[in-house]
């Protein structure tokens, strides 16, 4: 149908603006959690979550090329990032290439700009871009859904990173429901110079001790009503109190953003990154200057949200 052709064309155009001779360049975008709740621990040790994921315009870049020599050669701009099977990009590319018996090889150049171990799904997003890139480079013909089914084997956040936009994630993060795009707003990112592992975040979380859980349903309602202020007021992360107790700097960044005009500032994922939502670009720019001056955050980045449909609201 014409509608599905348009959709297919949008899928193809989402990431891949540049296709030079034999080179494909992909943007792997970061995510923030507008709301994050943990419902409990499952028999298998994983936690049951409910969270609202949102893509933002902050990205790593993957340049991929076919090579005559079989195998995968991955290089990165950061010396401490592994370039073998331990890297999710390598894992994703290898998984598809083995499944489809790809004869040629692949060279992947990964340039990281999303902070590492920051609760922004940088690694998962890189893997998502690798899935999309390999699928197109070798004309494997997989649909977005088929890529997402495979992606969950690489990591719980990877299917979402293929889908992008605004979504509710449930289960261990793999059950995804697309949501209407959020109202236009600006996002300030502040990451202190500390790393918090997801494991630490869960260890600091006393499930019985959570008085009031984040209002995820209220948050979804605000997004559906296209009400930025109602959305911001309901943004909450269940991990935040425990992590701030351990790392007060996260609370300081949050307070500074809110003093400087953020509608709300919240920790993303398992931290330590904080994001503030603003209704005005100039206010955000001023807050970014204050945050840089304060020395609280090692990474300060001012951006906005990424909507899948290129800013055209169509609530399917």
Residue map of PLM features:
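Short, basic/glycine-rich phosphate-binding loops at helix/coil junctions
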Residues: 68-82, 130, 225-235
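Short, small-residue-biased leader/transition segments that mark boundaries at the very start
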Residues: 1-7
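ATP-dependent small-molecule kinase catalytic core of the GHMP/sugar-kinase superfamily
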Residues: 22-27, 35-37, 41-51, 140-264, ...
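ATP-binding N-lobe of GHMP and related small-molecule kinases
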Residues: 19-118, 136, 140-145, 172, ...
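Glycine/serine-rich anion-binding loops at beta->alpha junctions
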Residues: 109-138, 156, 263-278
